[in-house]
Amino acid sequence: MKRFSFCLGMLLISLLMEAKICMPAYFSDYMVLQQKSVVQFHGRAASNREISLSVGWKKQPYTVVSDAAGCWRLDVPTPKAGGPYEISISDGEPLTLHHVMVGEVWLYAGEDHTLLSLPGVSDPEVRVLSVKPSIALAPQQDLPEGTEGWKDLSAEMTTQIPATAYYFACQLHRTLKVPVGLVSCVYPHTPIEAWNSFEALEQVPGYEEHTEMLSSLGFQPDKIEAAYARQREAWFQDLYTHDMGWCNNHQVWAEPKYQDENWKTMGLPGAWETQGLPNFDGVVWFRKTIDIPRAWHRKQLALDLGPIADEDIVFYNGKEIGRGQGDGRRLYTVPRNLVRRGKAVITIRVTNYEGEGGVLGMPDDMQLSVKGKKPLSLAGEWKYLSGLSLSGIAPVPISPSCDPNFPSGLYNALIHPLIGFPMQGIVWHQGISNLENVEEYADLQLSMIADWRDKWQRPDLPFLLVQQGSYGMAAEPADDSSLPFLREAQAAALMMNHTALVVTTDLSLQQATLQQKAFDKGFRLVQASLKQAYGKKRLPEFPSYLNHVVEGNMIRICWKEVGKSFAPVEPLRGFSVAGTDRVFYPATAIIDKKEVIVHSPEVPHPVAVRYNWADTTPGNLFSTSGLPAVPFRTDHW
């Protein structure tokens, strides 16, 4: 990857006025600096000017001379926790940072966006830097425009950061009794590949084409945008190529004489997911034959179809009369030269990329009319046939400048500017947006952790990972679901040192309020941080699978990190077993001291066992410390 020099990167920090010191946004009033670390104060000033930096915990100032481009840097050791301090930077014109604390600084990153309004909150020793969500094609040197700097924790700030982050910071402060700084760096509904740097993606199989493209284009935004435009155009052309209703650039299924007797029927308006096409994304053609009254002959018609998700092409007797996209109502005009009395065929080609698809809205939205006459309702039964399923083609290319899913886009904008700012550790709360490519998740997560540690030059930088909790309503074993596999991939990070997994499968929506869930996750994160970052080694952990032994028609499961014993409970839920046919059945489970024995009458010869292998997890196995067991499986089917 092309390396940008330090001074060239500094040019991107902000507009610079002569003789005025400019620094990255995380150097501000109310900031918290990591105690007993070395902070790299840096920025720009006038060229060849002596820079003086005074800190409240040291009598003698630090000095350096800016280079020809005005770039300067000073490495300043920080003391143990304390404050408030003032920090003054001057090149002849002073800039003073007020109310600076020294304590513990943590980065909270990912896609968690559970925001709660918590009135009455105020804690001057907990400070928050909420990073403005943004994306970038190349690594940035300063935080996104709109990032306002550090703030005291207040009721207003709780609506700007995830509730789990808030409870983590507050409980950490109360536990350690030192100032805490939280850098909140979240972007909802984003996948892990967007948080990986270019260098990290180079280490992950399957991203060779992406990284080679960026490298060959020199990371130049205009060239990357042009390449994306070509890819997107080619992708949409492929939709027509593979659409069975579109042959040799001709809309075969829109022709009025096309024989549609074997097509199924669907009531419109209405989402097709509830009418025979569940979980379908792709192209569906709709046809309806109507009678045009004699009085309408050779008159211009108004065609109202209501809202359509997501895109549509509309034909009247085989002739295209309009196209639409987005959520708006579809209003089209049928030219008078196409209108003849008698039979006419209206055809709608609908393309849906995600979510509900079809002709939506209300029955009164669908009508054909001529000025001064009673409209003809088009609601009711339509013939339909799918022309293309998107499950059979590559995903649509991701916009590099507009889509936060673009690989490396969030790392470039949100994480890279923070590199070098000392952190005690990182909380990673992300995952649900990777259900479509869960098989890549473990590699992406491991590469990201190693890369961030390398860039911070902290091979022991603690990573606390929040495992995805319950999702949806179904509590049955989920053989085809991606969510259990995501949890398994998240747990793979435990093979790296100084990592911790915070299990949340017991915190379902049915069992706790959002506020209580956030509080519990925050508490568990603090416990994990005490062990990984602060040397408290004797704290309880989440029980996890160690091994198992088949004993006749039963399986005996051995665990680690149980503590004294499991908490007694009847009935014990969440286990399933399978034989060589690989069909899993719910299992009866009993606790035997620090082990669990499972069996099922449907499986006389069990070979595999799973625990909490479902979207919404029913398991109730806890240690006596109140920590839930980690979901697992013994098979690799």
Language-model segments: residues:
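Short, aromatic- and glycine-rich surface loops/edge beta-strands on solvent-exposed regions
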Residues: 82-92, 345-348, 606-614
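An acidic-aromatic loop/edge-strand motif
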Residues: 95-152, 185-272, 343-412, 418-421
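Surface beta-strand/loop "capping" patches
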Residues: 34-41, 278-281, 302, 520, ...
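Ser/Thr-rich low-complexity repeats and stalk/linker segments
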Residues: 20, 26-104, 356, 587
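Short beta-strands within extracellular/lumenal beta-sheet-rich domains
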Residues: 25-29, 280-293, 330-332, 412
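C-terminal beta-sandwich/jelly-roll accessory domains of carbohydrate-active enzymes
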Residues: 556, 562-637
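Aromatic-lined ligand-binding clefts that engage carbohydrates, nucleic acids, or primary amines
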Residues: 263, 290, 296-318, 346-348
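Beta-strand-rich ligand-recognition modules
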Residues: 58-82, 314-365
